[in-house]
């Protein structure tokens, strides 16, 4: 009894626009030579992901001339109400609030050579002690106001520390000095 092996090369054609010339078509898996009823997949790369046809309009954040701060740093300064909500979120998660300040560099910078190191620009001075047992956001905001009076030209951030896991869970700039021009 003779057996024969049937082989057929699967050829996929992709219709591309000039903007998609450098993109790679999605992998559709191995083609089956058996005649199973299957639905034909569209090989057009625009069917993979879409944002409503506005692909040409997307932009990235400009990397030059923008200082890197903490979480929420791309937003305008927080109002007192927004700040209270952030601190309440921190407290609701069981994190210990703590204030830190930096009088000269409120952003990541390279101090120890020309290659980025984890600790470059990340050591800030702690304002007093962590606020263990704090349950009211107004206590944290009162400490923030006190730190602003003591160091009006410093960047001040609020961090939330998880004392069970021993990690910092949240950190955001709460005050930027008036001399800093965003």
Curated annotation (Swiss-Prot):
Location within or outside the cell: Plastid, Chloroplast
Gene transcribed to yield this protein: RBCS1
Function: RuBisCO catalyzes two reactions: the carboxylation of D-ribulose 1,5-bisphosphate, the primary event in carbon dioxide fixation, as well as the oxidative fragmentation of the pentose substrate. Both reactions occur simultaneously and in competition at the same active site. Although the small subunit is not catalytic it is essential for maximal activity.
Gene Ontology annotations of biological process type: photorespiration; reductive pentose-phosphate cycle
Keywords attached to this entry: Calvin cycle, Carbon dioxide fixation, Chloroplast, Photorespiration, Photosynthesis, Plastid, Transit peptide
Source species, domain of life: Eukaryota
Transit peptide: 1-56
Gene Ontology CC: one annotated term: chloroplast
InterPro entries: RuBisCO_ssu, RuBisCO_ssu_dom, RuBisCO_ssu_N, RuBisCO_ssu_sf
HAMAP family: RuBisCO_S_bact
SMART domains per record: RuBisCO_small
The name this protein goes by in its record: Ribulose bisphosphate carboxylase small subunit, chloroplastic 1
């Amino acid at each position: 009894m003779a057996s024969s092996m049937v082989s057929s090369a699967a050829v996929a054609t992709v219709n591309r626009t000039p903007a998609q010339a450098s993109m790679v078509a999605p992998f559709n898996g191995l083609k089956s030579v058996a005649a199973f009823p299957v639905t034909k997949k569209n090989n057009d790369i625009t069917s993979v992901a879409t944002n409503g046809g506005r692909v040409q309009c997307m932009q990235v954040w400009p990397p030059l001339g923008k200082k890197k701060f903490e979480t929420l740093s791309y937003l305008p300064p927080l109002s007192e109400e927004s700040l209270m909500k952030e601190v309440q979120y921190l407290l609701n998660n069981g994190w210990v609030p703590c204030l830190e300040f930096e009088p000269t560099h409120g952003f990541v910078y390279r101090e120890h050579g020309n290659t980025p190191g984890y600790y470059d620009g990340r050591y800030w001075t702690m304002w007093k002690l962590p606020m263990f047992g704090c349950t009211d956001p107004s206590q944290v905001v009162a400490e923030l106001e006190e730190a602003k009076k003591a160091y009006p030209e410093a960047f001040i951030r609020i961090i939330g520390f998880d004392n069970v896991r021993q990690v910092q869970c949240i950190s955001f700039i709460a005050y930027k000095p008036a001399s800093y021009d965003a």
